[in-house]
Design a protein with these regions (language model features):
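A short, Lys/Arg-rich alpha-helix, primarily the initiator
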Residues: 14-49
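Conserved hydrophobic/aromatic packing and binding residues within compact polymer-binding modules
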Residues: 42, 56-57, 67-70
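Alpha-helical residues within the helix-turn-helix
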Residues: 47, 58, 87
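Recognition helix of helix-turn-helix/homeodomain-like DNA-binding domains
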Residues: 61-76, 86
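Hydrophobic protein-protein interaction segments
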Residues: 118-119, 127-136, 141, 148-296
Length: 296
């Protein structure tokens, strides 16, 4: 496949819908910095990071008095000071850009479309990783868990779910936990659901993204059988949690790993996540290594 063909394929896969979310009214606790003044945004992020003014001032190497004046609106920070505050608050690139906009500065991080020529090398690398991971499933998702790319094994795992869940943008978490999605096939649904929702909550705490909050609320509302309630806190906890699901080849069990671009300075690329699944037992490994001639 040529680079141009790769770009064309990704352009068809990634629609404007993937990068757009309808945001409903969100409570102050989960509000986005989009709707706040600079002082309100800084106080919100301080609260989310559990930092006092003294803590943040020390981390950012600014005086507590100056930070207090910035938060109260009595002083305007320089761009340099604001970036130091953003770094001390551990803000993702998107949120750093928004903090700069709120203060009247231009954002410093680009947000390119996946179809941009500048993204070509990174996306070729992503596709190479997904392809090399075969015959084990692997996929790439954006910040809202919308599907960007997947290898053949991962696509096979989605066969048979409600077609409405496969309309772009395909949300991987919705497709997993929806009653007409993969949920009926997952044998340890309660445990996996608890694990994923906890991870999603951490993502929300990190980004204050109302679209992720809405997704968390939606997923939390999906039913699951009473027989699949979360395990007792007294039960032995394994080293890692695997997802076990029923397939045409029998029960398959996977461990998951998460990979991100460690040096990304583009918002879109920094938010791209690769989810790679490995066999959690020998039976699953042998079944997948036998080839892709049989459907999963």
């Amino acid at each position: 496949m040529t680079n141009q063909e790769c770009r064309s394929r990704w352009t068809k896969t990634i629609t404007s819908e993937v990068m757009t979310s309808t945001i409903q009214t969100v409570s102050l606790r989960h509000m986005s910095a989009l709707s706040t003044t600079l002082g309100e945004a800084l106080r919100m992020w301080r609260a989310r990071r559990r930092l006092s003014q003294l803590d943040l001032a020390g981390e950012a190497e600014v005086s507590t008095r100056h930070l207090s004046f910035i938060e109260s609106g009595r002083a305007s920070p320089s761009r340099h000071v604001l970036l130091r505050l953003a770094e001390a608050l551990r803000l993702p690139l998107r949120e750093q850009n928004q903090l700069l906009r709120t203060a009247g500065f231009a954002p410093i991080y680009e947000e390119r479309a996946f179809s941009s020529p500048d993204m070509e090398n990174a996306l070729v690398a992503v596709e190479a990783v997904l392809r090399a991971h075969a015959p084990f499933p692997a996929l790439a998702v954006d910040r809202h868990w919308n599907l960007v790319l997947a290898n053949d094994t991962a696509r096979q795992m989605l066969i048979g779910i409600d077609e409405r869940l496969l309309r772009p943008p395909v949300n991987v978490l919705r497709a997993t936990f929806h009653p007409q999605g993969l949920a009926p096939r997952i044998l340890n649904l309660a445990e996996w659901r608890h694990h994923v929702l906890s991870r999603l909550r951490r993502d929300i705490d990190q980004s204050a993204d109302p679209a992720l909050e809405a997704l968390h609320t939606e997923l939390s509302g999906f039913p699951f059988p009473a027989s699949r309630r979360p395990p007792s806190s007294t039960e032995r906890i394994a080293v890692t949690l695997s997802i076990r699901s029923e397939a045409n080849r029998g029960v398959m069990s996977f461990l998951s790993t998460t990979t991100v671009f460690g040096t990304a300075v583009d918002v879109t690329l920094a938010e791209l996540t690769l989810e790679c699944f490995y066999p959690a037992d020998e039976k699953t490994r042998k079944s997948l290594m036998e080839g892709m001639t049989k459907p999963l």
